């Protein structure tokens, strides 16, 4: 919106957020994040925007009077998607874009028959089951039920969004071949990749297009942003789960895969290993739908989010696809907004910068280069350090309030804030704290300055090893922070419930930003950009 580019963001209006994290006896405990308890003054309910989303059922094949094959998706379990709009205004522009989030609504709220029979739970069963779709962000997918809910969530918001987009195009009464000229859909990672077979279904089954025309339109409409280099993090769904939840889409994926593999076979005859790697349907460890492969095959471009990430994506993770379509792979480096992470979160520094170069830097960050001559001026340095000290004093108060630990504001604030994960290596950070603690105990203080190590982040509810790392952090902190021989030379604190609000306190106070993820695993590192 600040660039005056028109756009609409689609997603799910979750009733509860990721989760509210507390620490009890050193362990993470998850609580519902009731972020809507007081309502949301920015959103506008749109009850007139209600779309039917279908699950399950079966497909029925028939031939129409002209001899064309027709497929009907019948006996489905249906849910309504209702829109909530949030305006997103640009900074000092007249552009206001829209964030449209979908909330699940039951097609039938209440069964009077079951209620009159005294079966009160059964009376509201359908309502409860339907509205679970927009209940919680990222349900635990370590169980079959959790995985099924995630797949349903992804299809729910994708189907509603495409049903919202298509009528807007049809109002112009243009031919479908012009759809990609009017609509560009960016797939943010593989979570919405089911949009590819869904658009095919709508074009084939609802609007009666032939396969080749529908596929050409679909492929020219979508582009895919990849966010991870780790093969184990690339989303895959068991075929039997797909068959049960989205039987029509599975058939469409099979046909997409068949035609794509014929193309690969012509380009690389006799290379069965390549065919197996590039297939949308993976056979290893049970048949699975590879959503990243589907996203690549169904998109006109694929981008990484940093130059290194894009290079590794071409050379390693998707090398076979790059060899087939090198022109489709591009780099678009991620970024963060300076309006949020400098102008808003660090008003003291923002005021100092504006006093030196004026306010235009807020929407043109390149102007910060004009600060370079100030770096050698003692007066500017002193004012910069004053701002930093004020930010550290503010964070010190937050740390005391949230953890009970009193830290030294004159120490180096050594910060690692990101989700807790093995590849992000909070474990390495803790081992470094242990090493420094032992050196202090041994009196080896040469070149050492007082340091406060600050860690914050959440572990996925089903990720037991990440939770063990949180327990280790608190175990080490309990020893370090209560050892009088160490005093203010070293402190370790874990700030619970890392979120944007807490980040706005932590980031401006940071002296040292820890970016120690295993080499080659971090796609872009937007957290580093904020710091």
Model-predicted segments: where are they?
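A conserved ligand/cofactor-binding region detector
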Residues: 1-528
């Amino acid at each position: 919106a600040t660039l005056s580019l028109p756009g609409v963001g689609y997603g799910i209006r979750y009733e509860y957020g990721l989760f509210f994290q507390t620490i009890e006896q050193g362990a993470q405990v998850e609580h519902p994040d009731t972020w809507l308890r007081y309502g949301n003054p920015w959103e506008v309910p749109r009850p007139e925007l209600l779309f039917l989303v279908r699950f399950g059922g079966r497909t029925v094949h028939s031939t129409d009077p002209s001899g064309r094959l027709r497929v009907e998706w019948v006996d489905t379990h249906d849910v309504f998607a209702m829109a909530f709009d949030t305006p997103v205004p640009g900074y000092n522009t007249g552009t206001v874009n829209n964030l449209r989030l979908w909330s699940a609504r039951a097609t039938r709220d209440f069964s009077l028959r079951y209620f009159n029979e005294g079966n009160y739970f059964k009376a509201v069963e359908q309502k409860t089951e339907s509205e679970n779709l927009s209940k919680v962000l990222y349900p635990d997918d370590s169980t079959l039920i959790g995985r099924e809910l995630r797949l349903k969530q992804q299809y729910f918001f994708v189907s509603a969004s495409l049903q919202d987009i298509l009528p807007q195009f049809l109002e112009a009464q243009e031919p479908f071949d012009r759809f990609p000229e009017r609509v560009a859909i960016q797939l943010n990672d593989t979570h919405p990749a089911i949009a590819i077979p869904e658009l095919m279904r709508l074009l084939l089954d609802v609007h009666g297009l032939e396969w080749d025309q529908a596929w050409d339109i679909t492929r020219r409409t979508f582009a895919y942003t990849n966010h991870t280099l780790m093969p184990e993090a690339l989303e895959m769904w068991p075929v039997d789960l797909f068959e049960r939840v989205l039987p029509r889409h599975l058939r469409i994926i099979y046909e997409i895969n068949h035609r794509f593999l014929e193309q690969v076979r012509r380009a690389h005859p006799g290379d069965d290993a390549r065919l197996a790697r590039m297939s949308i349907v993976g056979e290893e460890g049970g048949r699975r739908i590879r959503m990243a492969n589907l996203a690549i095959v169904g998109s006109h471009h694929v981008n990484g989010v940093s130059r290194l990430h894009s290079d590794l994506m071409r050379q390693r993770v998707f090398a076979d696809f790059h060899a087939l379509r090198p022109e489709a792979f591009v780099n678009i480096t991620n970024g963060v907004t300076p309006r949020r992470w400098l102008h808003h979160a660090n008003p003291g520094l923002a005021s100092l910068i504006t006093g030196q170069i004026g306010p235009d830097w807020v929407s043109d960050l390149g102007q910060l280069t004009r600060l370079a001559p100030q770096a050698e001026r003692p007066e500017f340095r002193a004012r910069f350090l004053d701002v930093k000290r004020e930010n550290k004093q503010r964070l010190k108060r937050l740390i005391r309030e949230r953890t009970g630990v009193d830290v030294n504001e004159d120490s180096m604030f050594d910060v690692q804030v990101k989700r807790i994960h093995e590849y992000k290596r909070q474990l390495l950070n803790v081992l470094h704290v242990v090493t420094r603690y032992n050196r202090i105990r041994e009196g080896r203080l040469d070149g050492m300055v007082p340091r406060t190590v600050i860690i914050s982040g959440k572990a996925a509810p089903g990720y037991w090893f990440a939770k063990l790392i949180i327990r280790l952090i608190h175990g080490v902190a309990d020893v370090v922070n209560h050892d009088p021989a160490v005093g203010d030379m070293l402190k370790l604190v874990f700030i619970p419930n890392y979120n944007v609000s807490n980040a706005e306190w932590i980031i401006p106070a940071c002296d040292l930003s820890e970016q120690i993820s295993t080499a080659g695993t971090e796609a872009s590192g937007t957290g580093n950009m904020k710091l």
